């Protein structure tokens, strides 16, 4: 499930947690017990959002290397937490795997896992049913990241 398409073409209004939850839940229930892999927002040069103006430093020669995918999500923690809560809530309805795009560095892995745990805690404290998220994976798209998997793999497990 490529979640970024829910965030695009919305005239500056991002989907809230409830809207995302309903979409993910429908996908999970529609798969009737088969696992669903939900990729967190992967926006950037090739899939820009109409909501955010270009930030300082994003006008370099290769915009694909700028603030995108997990880097964008980590820079927008309230949006990312809402997405994570929606995914965890949908996982109460069937098996869900979480795919994090362009997760490359150990620090990004630690930040992401910390936010996943925070989202779990928020749902638990609110008494909201959630699934475990059967696995968390990362999309590897660069040679450097592929080579570093041996090092960062200990962080990701």
What are these regions (language model features)?
Residues 1-157:
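Conserved alpha/beta-domain cores
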């Amino acid at each position: 499930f490529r979640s970024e398409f829910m965030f695009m073409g919305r005239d500056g209004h991002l989907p809230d947690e409830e809207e995302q939850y309903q979409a993910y839940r429908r996908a999970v229930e529609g798969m009737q017990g088969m696992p669903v892999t939900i990729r967190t927002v992967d926006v950037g040069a090739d899939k820009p959002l109409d909501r955010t103006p270009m930030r300082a430093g994003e006008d370099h020669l290769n915009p694909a290397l700028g603030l995108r995918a997990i880097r964008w999500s980590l820079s927008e923690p309230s949006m990312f937490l809402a997405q994570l809560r929606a995914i965890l809530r949908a996982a109460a309805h069937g098996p869900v795997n979480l795919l994090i795009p362009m997760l490359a560095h150990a620090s990004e892995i630690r930040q992401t896992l910390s936010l996943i745990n925070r989202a779990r805690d928020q749902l638990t404290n609110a008494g909201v049913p959630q699934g475990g998220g059967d696995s968390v994976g990362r999309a590897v798209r660069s040679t450097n990241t592929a080579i570093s998997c041996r090092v960062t793999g200990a962080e990701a497990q």
